[in-house]
């Protein structure tokens, strides 16, 4: 299969630049994966499509305000740091711009000097290994000095950092939000539980690889970046019970979906587990755990568009996307949602 098989026309004005005020009032396109039938709803109507035997699996990762603006100690030149992956307590793999100013031994200063950094090594694909120096708790300093690392297609500044976090976010470590979860409010989750639907939480820390374009023509040649995940015993039991009782395992977002399929890759059963996944799901893949998916609208030619095509069929997905464009749905991270049932 070719990457160009997953292209579609998207007018730029349909790329959502900011979240809507009420999370659960985004639009919802409901797609029947068997028939290709489409319905147009509001996100909170998701309640009508859930049954007491079902289980919603949500990713409770929390986005780090991982974008730091600082200066080179020697020259005062402005620098931008993006934290990618923690290597040790104070050592991070980091993207540094401009890279030519960030040679080994270069030192940098942030804020009023409460955070300092030194490049101690070179990482993959032009990244730098950086050691940070500070007093106190790193996360608290990052909270004061850091900015949200919004995707490159969002040009507007975010007024409230919490709008780029899910209401159930808990485990810090992501470079991007698991955006399907942004549509849930505490009130909606309560109503879902009152209906008898189980909520199960896992963690996958989203890396920047999620925004990297596919650069090969043949999708089978694409290599995914690995991301850290973990699932506890309680969540595994809820998912296995749901399967045994004939309910649906509904993944909230492609991150939950990829984690479930990684852990359940052997025989569809899941267990307590943590590790790194680079699973790449595209048409031809047979889902082992996930029965249905709540997700946003993805970029043309992206691995996430391939993942949803593997669940609902490429033709059904491409048709639904063309309908979404025609009906002026909002796309990408702050956009509207789709329920593939």
UniProtKB/Swiss-Prot annotation:
GO BP terms: namely:
queuosine biosynthetic process; tRNA wobble guanine modification
Annotated catalysed reactions: 7-aminomethyl-7-carbaguanosine(34) in tRNA + S-adenosyl-L-methionine = epoxyqueuosine(34) in tRNA + adenine + L-methionine + 2 H(+)
Which cell locations does it reside in?
Cytoplasm
Q: Which keywords annotate this record?
A: Cytoplasm, Queuosine biosynthesis, S-adenosyl-L-methionine, Transferase
UniProt-listed Pfam families: Queuosine_synth
Pathway the protein contributes to: tRNA modification; tRNA-queuosine biosynthesis
Q: What is its EC number?
A: 2.4.99.17
One GO cellular component term of this record is: cytoplasm
* Highest rank taxon of the organism: Bacteria
Any idea which GO molecular function terms this record carries?
A: S-adenosylmethionine:tRNA ribosyltransferase-isomerase activity
Q: Which InterPro entries does this one have?
A: QueA, QueA_dom1, QueA_dom2, QueA_sf
Just give the chief location class.
cytoplasm
According to its UniProt record, this protein's enzyme class is transferase
Disulphide bridges, residue numbers:
none
Similarity-based family:
Belongs to the QueA family.
This chain's function reads: Transfers and isomerizes the ribose moiety from AdoMet to the 7-aminomethyl group of 7-deazaguanine (preQ1-tRNA) to give epoxyqueuosine (oQ-tRNA).
Q: How does it assemble?
A: Monomer.
Q: What is this protein called?
A: S-adenosylmethionine:tRNA ribosyltransferase-isomerase
Organism of this sequence: Clostridium botulinum (strain Hall / ATCC 3502 / NCTC 13319 / Type A)
Lineage start: Bacteria, Bacillati, Bacillota, Clostridia, Eubacteriales
Gene name, Swiss-Prot/TrEMBL: queA
